[in-house]
């Protein structure tokens, strides 16, 4: 007879054998499938990187991986490079194919580089070397009248530019002590801007609105209006203009250059173009390049105006770069530092103190909204950074009110201190009249029985709105704006038919220049109206209206 222990061990071996058989029935097919999958599976990108790293290590032990590197992967304007251990953030690097790039991501084991050119020319395994330079551009008066790309290279076919100096594209903005408050005017030549939303030298004034509402037209008219001072010899009155086109069509940029040439305004302007067909890194760096060019004038005691058209496209380009470099996305998929991107750019606009040369750089950034939504991420960011905004509305544009500036939503936080005194004297109540008109007009459409004062408010508001209309490429000097606004605010247009307001403007200005030139010349030279001149202007306006 078998002992109890022998029976127990025999039963255990039987159970174990059955368990092995059942496991084999389940596990063998799974192992076979897994084996087949493993045989047919593609290597992951990280595995490819590690394989390439091992191979590079094998052949490049003697070469110095601190100063050079090799391309692991390239695509979408981004190159991932193994090596370059000593590379600095935002350093310029050069590929053996001749393409240049900027080190934007410094990661353990590899460097993320954005390419300033076509990624088709860059091949896997290609050698990359440090240049020891941060991205810099040529600066100086030699750039005036030229069109350059995002890296400062000429693209207008007029030959090379022998710039007198070079400056880094990204530098720290001036501190608090070297600055002084805004106190000198930047005259745009637009009645609705100069009278209601005045801009000063060193200010940042945002131009915001939907597509095709005339944002670029406002900026372009401002450039054209500087011709009257830039043709003179007084350097303190000149305002040099830098226009940067980000993500725009090449045809649009060509048309803009042609317009400036036709109006003899290109000679005091510099165009920086990073068009829609350019790589995202170039659209990202172009505004910084333009800021460096404008800063040369600011730091040499001169005055410059810079127009960023537009920063929403720069933000989109930066979002593309950040996502491709696998930086964590935030609101609307923009990276967390997109606010810093725009703040460090716009803070470079400043009015310097006399001790620091007294120069200035004025910024007019442009932001395109979608469906009038100013509460989106980028518009709210830039509104909070700037010193005010000019808000353009599609609804006003389609009504024929051009420039389509919404006077109620537009504001200038620091410009009133810089406004031409004569304009401030006559335009003080203009904003109030227009606000009352908008309020009354909203209710007037519901009822026909209106009292006399309401009818007068409506009549004056309609005429003031008509008076603020202006044709493109026809900016007005302050001495021309003051008499017109004076006539409108003081009710001299109330009995003139709306269809004849434009005719009144032309004939009234001609009448003043012919018969009362002392008013025009006093505003031009002194910028303000004395009591005697105000009385003369009043009698001149009354006598002209009586015969009109």
Curated annotation (Swiss-Prot):
The keyword ATP-binding applies. Signal peptide: none annotated. The keyword ATP-binding applies. GO terms for cellular component: mitochondrial inner membrane; proton-transporting ATP synthase complex. GO terms for molecular function: ADP binding; ATP binding; proton-transporting ATP synthase activity, rotational mechanism. Keywords: ATP synthesis, ATP-binding, CF(1), Hydrogen ion transport, Ion transport, Membrane, Mitochondrion, Mitochondrion inner membrane, Nucleotide-binding, Transit peptide, Transport. It comes from the Eukaryota. ATP binds at residues 209-216. It is found in: Mitochondrion; Mitochondrion inner membrane. Its main location: mitochondrion. The record marks 410 as: Required for activity. InterPro entries: ATP_synth_asu-like_sf, ATP_synth_asu_C, ATP_synth_asu_C_sf, ATP_synth_F1_a_nt-bd_dom, ATP_synth_F1_asu, ATPase_a/bsu_AS, ATPase_F1/V1/A1_a/bsu_N, ATPase_F1/V1/A1_a/bsu_N_sf. Coiled coil: none annotated. F-type ATPases have 2 components, CF(1) - the catalytic core - and CF(0) - the membrane proton channel. CF(1) has five subunits: alpha(3), beta(3), gamma(1), delta(1), epsilon(1). CF(0) has three main subunits: a, b and c. Mitochondrial membrane ATP synthase (F(1)F(0) ATP synthase or Complex V) produces ATP from ADP in the presence of a proton gradient across the membrane which is generated by electron transport complexes of the respiratory chain. F-type ATPases consist of two structural domains, F(1) - containing the extramembraneous catalytic core, and F(0) - containing the membrane proton channel, linked together by a central stalk and a peripheral stalk. During catalysis, ATP synthesis in the catalytic domain of F(1) is coupled via a rotary mechanism of the central stalk subunits to proton translocation. This is ATP synthase subunit alpha, mitochondrial. It comes from Kluyveromyces lactis (strain ATCC 8585 / CBS 2359 / DSM 70799 / NBRC 1267 / NRRL Y-1140 / WM37) (Yeast). The gene is ATP1.
């Amino acid at each position: 007879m078998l002992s109890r222990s022998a029976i127990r061990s025999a039963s255990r071996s039987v159970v174990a054998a059955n368990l092995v058989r059942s496991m084999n029935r389940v596990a063998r097919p799974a192992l076979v499938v897994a084996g087949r999958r493993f045989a047919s599976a593609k290597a992951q990108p990280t595995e490819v990187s590690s394989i390439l790293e091992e191979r590079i290590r094998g052949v490049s032990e003697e070469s110095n991986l601190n100063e050079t590197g090799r391309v692991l992967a390239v695509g979408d304007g981004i190159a991932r490079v193994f090596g370059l251990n000593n590379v600095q953030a935002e350093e310029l690097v050069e590929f053996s194919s001749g393409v240049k790039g900027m080190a934007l991501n410094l990661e353990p084991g590899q460097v993320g580089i954005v390419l300033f050119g076509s990624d088709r020319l860059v091949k896997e395994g290609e050698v990359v070397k440090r240049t020891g330079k941060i991205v810099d551009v040529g600066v100086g008066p030699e750039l005036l009248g030229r069109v350059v790309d995002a890296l400062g290279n000429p693209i207008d076919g007029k030959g090379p530019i022998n710039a007198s100096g070079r400056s880094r594209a990204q530098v720290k903005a001036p501190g608090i002590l070297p600055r002084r408050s805004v106190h000198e005017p930047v005259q745009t030549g637009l009645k609705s801007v100069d009278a209601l939303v005045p801009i000063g030298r060193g200010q940042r004034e945002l131009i915001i609105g939907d597509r095709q509402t005339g944002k670029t037209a406002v900026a372009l008219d401002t450039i054209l209006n500087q011709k009257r001072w830039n043709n003179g010899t007084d350097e303190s009155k000149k305002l040099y203009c830098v226009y940067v086109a980000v993500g725009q069509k090449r045809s649009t940029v060509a048309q803009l250059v042609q317009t400036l040439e036709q109006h003899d305004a290109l000679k005091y302007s510099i165009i920086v173009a990073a068009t829609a067909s350019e790589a995202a890194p170039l659209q990202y760096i172009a505004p910084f390049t333009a800021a460096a060019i404008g800063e040369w004038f600011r730091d040499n005691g001169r005055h410059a105006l810079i127009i960023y058209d537009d920063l929403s496209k720069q933000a989109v380009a930066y979002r593309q770069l950040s996502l491709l470099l696998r930086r964590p996305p935030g609101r609307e998929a923009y990276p967390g530092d997109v606010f810093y991107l725009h703040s460090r750019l716009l803070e470079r606009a400043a009015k310097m103190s006399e001790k620091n040369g007294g120069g200035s750089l004025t910024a007019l950034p442009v932001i395109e909204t979608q469906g009038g939504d100013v509460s989106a991420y980028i518009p709210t960011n830039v509104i909070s950074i700037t010193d005010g905004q000019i808000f353009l509305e599609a609804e006003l544009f389609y009504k024929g009110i051009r420039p389509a500036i919404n006077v109620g939503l537009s504001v200038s936080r620091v410009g009133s201190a810089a406004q031409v005194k004569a304009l401030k004297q006559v335009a003080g109540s203009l904003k109030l009249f227009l606000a009352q008109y908008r309020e009354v007009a909203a209710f007037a459409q519901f009822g026909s029985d209106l009292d006399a004062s309401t009818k007068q408010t409506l009549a004056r508001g309609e005429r003031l709105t008509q008076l603020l209309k202006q044709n493109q490429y026809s900016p007005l000097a302050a001495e021309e704006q003051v008499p017109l606004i004076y006539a409108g605010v003081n009710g001299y247009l109330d009995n003139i038919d709306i269809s004849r307001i434009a005719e009144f403007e032309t004939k009234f200005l001609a009448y003043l220049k012919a018969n009362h030139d002392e008013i025009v010349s006093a505003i031009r030279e002194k910028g303000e109206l004395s009591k005697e001149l105000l009385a003369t202007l009043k009698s001149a306006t009354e006598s002209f209206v009586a015969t009109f």
